[in-house]
Regions:
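Glycan-recognition and catalytic cores of secretory/periplasmic carbohydrate-active enzymes
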Residues: 1-206
Length: 206
């Protein structure tokens, strides 16, 4: 979909890419409705790290791109519907730390584990989805929620920059001291962990 939006000097290729994008999206949505998030079985698979909140943001972002390309209301509806899960995973109330930190995302609605960022760089998908929604559906009733999400996340990132000063790098995120208790997410994040993974995690967090 993104390629179709950017290749404006080749109408034939643009049309082909749009058709493929719609077909791929339809296939992916059909499988998702059938299997949900499914279970991964491939060893060394780094996509284990992707959280449910990120998957839902990705669905929304993809649908928004197709809506921008085609103008079909069905894509707009999907984009607005699936981002609601992601919004429910964002921390909007301040933590009880000295900075009142908020704005980050949890991996799922249970809010047991926080999204941390690794070298694969998937963190941008949350804001890509929110921004595309704001650009394509300005009259939607949820528009203020999307804007608020962007503002909260921006404040969160800016608030953390002091911890990496003067290097100008974004930290991987805040951590919950007892995330190891969320065993499903903990062992999906850390492939082939040692027997004392809980102790090692606790030591690093301290």
């Amino acid at each position: 979909a993104y390629a179709s939006m950017t290749l404006d000097n080749d109408p034939m290729q643009q049309e082909y890419l749009l058709r493929v994008a719609e077909e791929d999206f339809a296939f992916a949505m059909e499988k998702f409705k059938k299997d949900g998030f499914d279970q991964f079985v491939q060893p060394y698979e780094h996509s284990y790290n992707t959280s449910k909140s990120q998957y839902m943001a990705t669905i929304s972002w993809s649908a928004s791109q197709l809506y921008k390309l085609t103008g079909k209301p069905s894509y707009a509806d999907i984009a607005a519907e699936y981002i609601r899960y992601t919004l429910d995973c964002q921390r909007t109330e301040p933590l009880k730390d000295k900075d009142g930190t908020r704005g980050f995302f949890y991996r799922d609605k249970s809010r047991k584990s926080i999204v941390h960022y690794i070298h694969q760089s998937r963190e941008q998908v949350y804001m890509q989805a929110m921004v595309m929604l704001c650009e394509t559906q300005k009259e939607h009733p949820d528009y203020p929620k999307w804007v608020n999400s962007i503002q909260l996340y921006g404040d969160y990132l800016k608030g953390m920059m002091k911890y990496t000063h003067p290097y100008g790098m974004i930290p991987s995120g805040v951590y919950h001291a007892e995330e190891y208790k969320d065993t499903t997410n903990f062992y999906a994040l850390h492939l082939f962990p040692p027997a004392n993974a809980k102790e090692l995690y606790t030591e690093q967090i301290k």
